[in-house]
């Protein structure tokens, strides 16, 4: 089972597949060296990066992420402020301290990290790391970053868990979830809670959900109070802080019934601007789509009612289980299925979560998730300059509003839908696989080649 601990991971921007995943792969490689007693013998490290991971790698800070992983750090606890200085020293000395300095290896990023235009056979995001003793290969491993910060090595690709923990309500699709809810009388979030408690203690679960929401709130706050220009050649100006000042100044005087949309946009922009700047964010389900789930919950708090711990937990658990359906039966990787697998999935998750805390039945929750994805089908991933900025930041704002609209449509529907959530998930995956590779996070088509970076 894909847990809420897997779906919502605290990490850093700008990309879950191209930053968080590669950093975790680097750290896993170092852990493997330590386990095999090879770390102290390692004198040289080489890295080969392939496919989408290579084509948009520099814009997504993939090179930096791999180096920091090899240095022994993970996305949730790496000191973000210390990264630039660490990377500058590695570039200057061509030496890389491994495992937080336990061993120092020769590593010149200019020659020892090669970005290939070719693809590895199993997934669009591949990388191979090699440890050497002088010229002799000590250990070599290929990893795939399969979206949302999930990684898998070559030997375990597409393999099921050997000894999965049994949960009271196992499921493979939305139909299973709805059947369990109908038979048990449980809400969707209550059912997910019971499954999670088979994997984690109540304290662990509550602490994780609390930490996830607090991290999301802190990210919104930073985004609303930080101005300037985002890193990279596009020179994109931050907009959330300016919009915040405008809304605060005019909120009490405005009779515009649409001003709520400005607030929703602002919440999403704040998060995604922080992500683009390499800040601390939560995968939801990915970094490129990390603004939607928090923006919709912030909307609830601002315009619907106060947030209790129970409401936050119900929202996040519902979002998580909907995301898990896409992860199990389709993909949450922009490199594999385009942006429909990132922003589309996040929109679907948030629509479901909002419907749950507004009192929707399990059927209405799944209808909301279906509506949200149905109208994201075919969404391309064509980041300008290989950066998670244009069109990604605005796209999160648009999808946040769309998620709320999908929820409202589902809750006010009086007829049965013709399209099920399972069918739209199946359609999304097939659409993504049919999509030309230039529209799947390679920056070789669409807006990515129409907008010239200065």
Please place each PLM-identified region on the residue numbering.
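Conserved phosphate/anionic-ligand binding catalytic regions in large, soluble enzymes, centered on
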Residues: 8-26, 277-296, 337-347
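Accessory carbohydrate-recognition regions in carbohydrate-active enzymes
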Residues: 12-55, 122
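Alpha-helical support elements that line or immediately flank enzyme active sites
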Residues: 17-34, 294-306, 351-359
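Short, mixed-charge aromatic SLiMs
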Residues: 44-57, 89-97, 243, 315-328, ...
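C-terminal regulatory domains involved in ligand/effector binding and gene-expression control
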Residues: 75-253
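Accessory "access/gating" subregions that flank catalytic or transport cores
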Residues: 202-334, 338, 446-454
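Hydrophobic alpha-helical bundle architecture
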Residues: 307, 318, 324-397, 409-418
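Extended hydrophobic packing segments that form well-structured cores
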Residues: 418-454
């Amino acid at each position: 089972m894909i847990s809420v601990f897997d779906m919502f991971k605290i990490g850093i921007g700008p990309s879950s597949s191209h930053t968080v995943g590669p950093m975790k792969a680097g750290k896993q490689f170092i852990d493997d060296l330590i386990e095999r007693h090879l770390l102290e013998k390692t004198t040289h490290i080489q890295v080969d990066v392939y496919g989408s991971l290579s084509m948009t790698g520099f814009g997504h800070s993939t090179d930096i992420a791999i180096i920091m992983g090899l240095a022994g750090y993970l996305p949730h606890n790496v000191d973000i402020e210390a990264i630039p200085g660490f990377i500058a020293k590695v570039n200057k000395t061509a030496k890389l301290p491994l495992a937080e300095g336990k061993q120092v290896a020769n590593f010149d990023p200019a020659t020892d990290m090669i970005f290939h235009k070719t693809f590895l056979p199993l997934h669009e995001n591949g990388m191979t790391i090699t440890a050497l003793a002088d010229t002799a290969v000590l250990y070599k491993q290929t990893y795939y970053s399969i979206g949302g910060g999930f990684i898998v090595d070559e030997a375990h690709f597409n393999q099921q868990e050997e000894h999965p923990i049994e949960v009271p309500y196992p499921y493979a699709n939305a139909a299973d979830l709805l059947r369990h809810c109908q038979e048990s009388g449980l809400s969707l979030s209550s059912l997910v809670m019971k499954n999670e408690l088979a994997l984690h203690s109540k304290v662990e679960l509550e602490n994780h959900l609390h930490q996830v929401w607090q991290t999301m709130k802190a990210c919104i706050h930073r985004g609303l109070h930080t101005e300037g220009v985002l890193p990279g050649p596009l020179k994109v100006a931050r907009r959330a802080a300016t919009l915040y000042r405008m809304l605060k100044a005019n909120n009490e005087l405005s009779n515009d019934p649409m001003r709520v949309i400005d607030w929703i946009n602002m919440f999403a922009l704040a998060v995604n601007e922080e992500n683009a700047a390499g800040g601390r964010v939560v995968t939801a389900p990915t970094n490129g789509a990390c603004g939607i789930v928090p923006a919709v919950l912030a909307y609830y708090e601002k315009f619907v009612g106060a947030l209790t711990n129970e409401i936050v937990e119900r929202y996040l658990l519902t979002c998580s289980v909907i995301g898990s359906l896409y992860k199990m039966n389709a993909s949450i990787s922009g490199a594999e299925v385009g942006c429909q697998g990132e922003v589309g999935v996040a929109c679907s998750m948030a629509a479901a979560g909002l419907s749950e805390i507004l009192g929707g039945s399990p059927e209405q929750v799944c209808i909301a998730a279906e509506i949200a994805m149905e109208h994201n089908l075919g969404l391309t991933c064509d980041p300008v300059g290989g950066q998670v900025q244009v069109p990604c930041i605005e796209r999160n704002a648009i999808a946040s509003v769309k998620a709320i609209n999908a929820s409202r449509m589902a809750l006010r529907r009086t007829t049965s839908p013709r399209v099920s959530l399972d069918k739209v998930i199946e359609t999304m995956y097939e659409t993504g696989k049919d999509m030309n590779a230039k529209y799947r996070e390679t920056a070789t088509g669409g807006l990515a080649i129409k907008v010239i970076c200065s």
